[in-house]
Amino acid sequence: MDYDFKAKLAAERERVEDLFEYEGCKVGRGTYGHVYKARRKDGKDEKEYALKQIEGTGISMSACREIALLRELKHPNVIALQKVFLSHSDRKVWLLFDYAEHDLWHIIKFHRASKANKKPMQLPRSMVKSLLYQILDGIHYLHANWVLHRDLKPANILVMGEGPERGRVKIADMGFARLFNSPLKPLADLDPVVVTFWYRAPELLLGARHYTKAIDIWAIGCIFAELLTSEPIFHCRQEDIKTSNPFHHDQLDRIFSVMGFPADKDWEDIRKMPEYPTLQKDFRRTTYANSSLIKYMEKHKVKPDSKVFLLLQKLLTMDPTKRITSEQALQDPYFQEDPLPTLDVFAGCQIPYPKREFLNEDDPEEKGDKNQQQQQNQHQQPTAPPQQAAAPPQAPPPQQNSTQTNGTAGGAGAGVGGTGAGLQHSQDSSLNQVPPNKKPRLGPSGANSGGPVMPSDYQHSSSRLNYQSSVQGSSQSQSTLGYSSSSQQSSQYHPSHQAHRY
C-alpha cells in the first residue's frame, strides 16, 4: 500500500481520545485491558458508553473471535458492540459498548450482605422471574444462531440502569463463545477447560468431549438458584484453574451433596464419560443418599410443588440429553403465572443498588485478598469497587474469588450507597403484566422498558450467523467487566472483588 495513502488514512481515522471523554472514569481492570465509562465530547447524545481498551499491541485470537461474534449478534438481551477503534500510532484496540450500570454479581452480593447484617432483603420474586426470562431469551437467540456462550455466571449478566433500556438484561463476555455447527474437531480438544467451576455442568467435569447447548442451560439453572437464595448453589473450594484436567473432585462432591448421586436410570450415559472410572474410584453413591435438590431448596423456603422449583429442577437435570432447552424453558408454566415477566426487571421498584465507582489509575483493583488476582479468562462489563458497609458483611457461602470477575453492580454491601428499604412494588401490578393467556415475550430494545413482555414484540432469529470462529487455545480468559477481553480470575466471592464485565 502506498505510504502517502496510509499516512492520509491514518490522519482521517477517528481517534478515541478525540471522540470520547473518559479520563479518570475507569470502572474495570483486567490482565487484558481496562474499561472506562465514557461520554461523547461533541454532545451529540447524553448516552453513557463502556470503552474498553485492550492491553498490549495488536489483538488476541480471543478478542478477534469476540469482535467477530458481537458484530453479528443483534438482540435486546445481548450486549451491543457499537464500534471498534484501531490506533495505528500505539497499536491499541478500543471496543465501544453500551454501558450497563449493574450486574447480577453485585446485585446478589447486595442481598447476601443484607442477610449477613441481619436485615434480610430478598430479591423480589417478580424481579427474579423477569431476570431469568430475559437471560433465557438472550441465550435462546445465541443457541438459535449456533453460538454457545460457555461462561455464563452472575458477573456476565449485566442489567441496564436508568435510561431508555432501564432494567434490561444484557448477556456479556463473549470471549469464550464458540460456534458449534460442524466443528473441525471436538470442542473439548480445542478448549479443555471452559466455564467457571461453580457454574460448570457435570458432563464437563466428567470430561465430555462433544458437549452441547446444555452446558449453558445448567449454568442458567445455577444462576436461577442463586437469585432465589442469594448464595451460589454449588460453591466449593477452588483449585488450580489453569489445569487441563476437567475432573474436579470438590466440585462434583458439592453437586452431589446438593443434588444427590445420579441413579443409573436418570443418567444412563454417565458410564460413557471419560472420567467415569475416576468417579467410581473416588465416590460412593451411599454418601449422598440423603441429598436432594428438594431438601436444599426447602431450606430456602422454596416448595417442591411450586412452579419455580419445577423449572429449576428441569434446568439442573444431571443428564444433558434430558435437560430442558432454552426454547422449552421460555414456554414453562412458571412464566405464565402472575406476576408475569416484564421488560424492566425493576418494574414497580426503585433501584436500590449502588452505581459503579471509579477506580484509581494507579491502585490495584484488588486491595484485600491477592488470591483474587487469579481470574478465569473472560470478558466483563465495568464494575465499580463495592463500597464497604459499616461492619464487614460475613458472606454466608465462601465467596467466589470472582470467577465472577465482577461483572458488577457497583459494589454492594447491604445498605451501601443504596436505599435502606427494600424494593417497593407498584400497587397496580396489572401495569407490568402481559395480557392473560398470552405468551410473554420480551420486546425490542426500543420498547417501553416498564411495560409488559408482549408476545409479538419480536421474533427469535433462527438463521445462522455467517461467521467462522477462530480456534482459541485452552487458556482461560480473565475479564475486565462484562465487556469481555480475556483475563484470569480465581473463583471466590469477595466483597472487594470488582472486575467489570463487557
Swiss-Prot record:
Annotated active site: 151
Superkingdom assignment: Eukaryota
Pfam families recorded: Pkinase (PF00069)
One of the protein's GO biological processes: cellular response to lipopolysaccharide
Domain Protein kinase: 21-335
Cellular localisation: Cytoplasm; Cytoplasm, Perinuclear region; Nucleus
Catalytic activity: L-seryl-[protein] + ATP = O-phospho-L-seryl-[protein] + ADP + H(+); L-threonyl-[protein] + ATP = O-phospho-L-threonyl-[protein] + ADP + H(+)
Modified residues (Phosphoserine): 449
Biased composition (Low complexity): 371-392, 468-496
Keywords in alphabetical order: Acetylation, ATP-binding, Cytoplasm, Disease variant, Epilepsy, Kinase, Nucleotide-binding, Nucleus, Phosphoprotein, Serine/threonine-protein kinase, Transferase
Statement: the UniProt record of this protein carries the keyword Protease: no
Compositional bias of kind Gly residues: 408-421
Chief location bin: cytoplasm
EC number(s) from the headed UniProt entry: 2.7.11.22
Protein name: Cyclin-dependent kinase 19
Organism: Homo sapiens (Human)
